[in-house]
Amino acid sequence: KFKVNGNEKYSGTIQIGLKENDKNTFADVILANNKVNEKSLTGIGESAILDEGLLKKEDDHGVAYYFRGNVKNNNVLFADKNWKIVKINGDGSIKLVLDGVIDELSKYYEEDYAFSNSTIYKNLEKWYTNTLDSYGDYIAYYKYCNDYVLDDDNYLAYNRVITNKIPTYVCLGNLVNSRIGLLTVDEVSLAGGSTSENKKFYLYNEKITGAYYTMSGAMT
């Protein structure tokens, strides 16, 4: 949880699922049009400012494929909104992040660190109902990772990603069933983010002028 004062704008993520008997899935199209690179050009924890393409890493469901750096070919138009492809999940569904902002943000939490009880989740659910509900057949009911497990004097996610620089797609926190959520700090790091400002990776959004919100915990 990254706390800021006042209201900000933020972006949400959804998972595009599979329909039975589909022979050419969205994941198939992505893999057919992108070479899977063996390793990243920059170290994990460093800002990725070049197009590092598609890489692979294990997640909770199997082998996942993710984009990293200043990628240009991960754009998708869905539900009349522009999205960025974050990764192909191990189960074949696709994680998208909105390439824009959702207005009307309240603070991430009141007195609770749990995402499912947060004000931001209620706002995301409201936005989903008003904007994406009619596309529900294509959006997966997914287990999002809400990693707010304490580890000594900080949160496990902070120590793992910021201090030790070993981000993972395997959830070490609590899984939240939802059709919409936020990225984790692990996902931001693997996409090319770091503790330094990076304006040259695909998650950078000039419309977000305040703090980024994730589903991972951190002391402020």
What are these regions (language model features)?
Residues K1-K23:
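C-terminal, structured domain-capping segment
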Residues D22-T220:
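Long, domain-scale functional regions
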